[in-house]
Amino acid sequence: MPHRSRHKKGRSRSVRPAHPTVPTWIQYTPDEVEQLVVELARRGFPPSQIGIILRDQYGIPLVKPITGKKLTKILEEHGIRQEIPEDLLNLIKRALRIRKHLEEHPKDMASRRGLQLVESKIHRLIKYYKRVGKLPKEFVYNPEALSHLAT
């Protein structure tokens, strides 16, 4: 339950390290961490999941202070690159799930509103990724064409 006069909403969550320096307890070299990242990616884990696995199972709080490179940069260097960035992909999957729900329940107006909100986030992210160069300029969000991602 949330505390009355705090803004945290009562959700538990892990705290990012305040000073991103290499902790003294880490026994892994930068090359070993890089190999762990590549191995986990080849086993099919997305970048966010790799970070969680490294934190929980290997005791590595952050990859960048140890290796000097971001996790996604390591994956790109080893030829493991996602066509669509992970956050955008997750939003697209959510929108496809809501669309499927609306096919069965067309009068569910709350879900229709939720779909509008999710799709506006998708359009904003697409604009950003086109500007930054992570998506090609001709990329267009088309739910029917991207329905193969729902699985």
Swiss-Prot record:
- Please name the GO terms that the record assigns under molecular function: small ribosomal subunit rRNA binding; structural constituent of ribosome
In terms of CDD domains, this protein maps to: Ribosomal_S15p_S13e
Tell whether Translocase is among the UniProt keywords.
no
Membrane-crossing segments per the record: none
Residue stretches of biased makeup (Basic residues): 1-16
Biological process (GO) annotations held by this record are: translation
> Which PROSITE patterns does this chain map to?
RIBOSOMAL_S15
Q: Name the SUPFAM superfamilies on file.
A: S15/NS1 RNA-binding domain
Specify whether rRNA-binding is a keyword of the entry: no
**UniProt xrefs under SMART domains:** Ribosomal_S13_N (SM01386), Ribosomal_S15 (SM01387)
* UniProt-annotated stretches for the region Disordered: 1-21
GO CC entries: cytosolic small ribosomal subunit
Q: Which UniProt keywords apply?
A: Ribonucleoprotein, Ribosomal protein
Record's HAMAP family? Ribosomal_uS15_A
The record's subunit annotation is: Part of the 30S ribosomal subunit.
PANTHER family per record: RIBOSOMAL PROTEIN S15P/S13E, SMALL RIBOSOMAL SUBUNIT PROTEIN US15
The family line of this record is: Belongs to the universal ribosomal protein uS15 family.
Name of the protein in question: Small ribosomal subunit protein uS15
